[in-house]
Amino acid sequence: MNFNGISASELPIYIKEQETRELSCEGCLNGEALDFDFTMAFQPLIDLSQKCTFGFEGLVRGLNNEPAHTVISQVTAQNVYKFDQSCRVKAIALAAEAKIKERLSINFMPGAVYKPNICIRTTLAAADKYGFPREQITFEVVEEEKIADTAHLQNIIDYYKEIGFKVAIDDFGSGFANLDWLAKLAPDSIKIDMSLIRGIDTSNRKTLIVKALAELCSALNIDVLAEGVETKAERDTLAELNIVKQQGYFFSPPLFETFPSVPEKKFN
C-alpha cells in the first residue's frame, strides 16, 4: 500500500515516531487521535456444521454508512498507526455495547505495527475499558503490498497469539498471501479469497484448488473459512469440500453498526 507517495518500506520510520509519542492508548480511546471520524459495519461468520454464527468481521464505514474507500482514502503515512489503533477501539466498543458472545474479527495492517508490545496496549486497554474478553478477538492480517520483512510479521503474530488473541490471514490465495506464510507464520486460520470462491460450483479448477488448500490446512491444523459466498450453490459446493465456515452476502451483507442475525433458512 502506498500512502501519499510514502511506500511500505518507509512506513516503519513514521510508525516508530507515532508509537514513541505514546498517542495510542489515551488518544485513541478518547477519540482524539485522528482528524477524521468513522464507524463500522459488521458481517457474520457462520458455521454450517453447527448452524450458527460464530463471529463477526468489523469493516470500516463513514459516519453515514459511506463505503470503506471513502474512509481509507484519508489514511496517510502520518496517521496510519493511529487509524489502525482507532479501528481496533471502535470495533471493540461497538461489540461490547452490543454484548456479543461471538468472536470479533478486526483487520490490521502489518505495516502499521512497529513494536507489537507497544501497539497492542491500545487493544488491551480498550478490551478492559469496555469489558470485552480478549480471547474473543481475532486479528486478520490485511496487506496490499508485498511484505519484505516476513520475520517482523511473524514476530507480531507470535506475540499476539502469546497473549491470547487468534490470528487469521485474510484474502488467502490472492495478492501477496502465499503458501510460504502457512509454514512461516502458522496462523490459526485463513480466509480463502473470494476470487477462488465466486462460481466455484461451476469451475472444476477452482474446486480442485480449494479442495487441495483445505486438505493442506487440515493437515497443518489451520482453520479455513471461505469468504465472498453469494449463492446457495457456492455454499453447498464448499460444504461438500468440508469447508463449513463461510462468510458472504448469501448469509448477510455487512450492516451498519449492527451485528446481523442469519435466517435459519440460510443454513438449510
Locations of regions flagged by a protein language model:
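EAL-family c-di-GMP phosphodiesterase catalytic domain
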Residues: 1-34, 48-52, 143-147, 176-268
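A short, well-structured catalytic beta-strand-centered motif of the EAL phosphodiesterase domain
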Residues: 36-71
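Structural preference for beta-strand elements that scaffold enzyme active sites
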Residues: 37-39, 55, 103-105, 136-140, ...
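Short acidic-capped amphipathic helix/loop micro-motif used as an active-site/signal-coupling element
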Residues: 63-66, 88, 171, 248
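Signature for phosphate-centric chemistry
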Residues: 64, 106, 171, 193, ...
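Catalytic-site-adjacent helices and loops of nucleotide signaling machinery
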Residues: 73-76, 169-179, 235
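Catalytic core of bacterial c-di-GMP phosphodiesterases, primarily the EAL and HD-GYP domains
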Residues: 83-152
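Surface-exposed amphipathic alpha-helices with a cationic face
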Residues: 128, 154-166, 211-218, 239
